[in-house]
């Protein structure tokens, strides 16, 4: 039987009943206000929330912000989906640590901008960018936007329909290629999640040659419903492992470094991606919260949680006047800054980037 991959709106709808069960438990308190500050979190993990942190020039507009990454200088890189019809509008924006706009580029990803990561190679930093919808590609770029290489569907994997590497239409099926995010390997290679297409995790070598794949569409335990985000977990005291967000199943799955299934961690509201800092793992959940786990994968804080509110107010993502300070709507990605602060990108119509500054 052919299994068809649901699109994002379908899984948000399908997940509503399950997500209603994921409420603001004791660990997920509502943000509190201290004088003019908005604080979220608890115990040793409290953060000052600054919504709409970057200062975007008036000539540009956010068009559904998707992912964020930080370079060694502390600059923030933001990718948004962009509108296909605005082909000259950039999809990637760069801001300095003081919130100021630095540059913009990446119009080639308009209408499909999705994943972005920064990686240092031989003393130089590069961007890795994944695009879905009709764009259907991934690229390595310099920090100023020059293309190093450009890739499309790995046909040698045997996963895709004939011609998928030249197909310019979005194919939301297990035979289609709609890449979402990256993770980096110690040998210079990388992993690419085909989260909205085949749900395979593809391994590439340091020269961007396809090596192998694992995963695919299925019901879990090594297969996925939406293999949306991933990370190589190298936190102290743990054996290195690959962690994949199986978003539509509401779980994280862990794998050995050669792609063998280990375990499933349940209890997430559409987990979208992963980052780590010291002993912490960060999991942005599309269902209105950001979760922090310790080195034992125990939940230590849930930040900006507004699960019940998002469940109750239909179409909240398009109603900015209804958003509450310190609460998230749809966190789609998050990453740590060098000092442990957190940037959050939300899948909302107007786009929104928040900075969480740690206060305890």
Q: Which residue stretches match the model-derived regions?
A:
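N-terminal secretory signal peptides and thylakoid transit peptides that target proteins
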Residues: 2-19
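Beta-strand-rich domains and repeat architectures in extracellular enzymes and scaffolds
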Residues: 51-85
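Beta-rich, blade/repeat-based domains predominating
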Residues: 59-73, 109-123, 159-189, 219-240, ...
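Blade/loop signatures of beta-propeller domains
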Residues: 31-50
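Surface-exposed loop and turn segments in beta-propeller and other repeat-based domains
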Residues: 54-59, 105-109, 149-173, 211-222, ...
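A short loop-to-beta-strand structural motif that recurs across blades of beta-propeller domains
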Residues: 89-93, 137-139, 200-202, 251-253, ...
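Blade-loop segments of beta-propeller domains
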Residues: 88-121
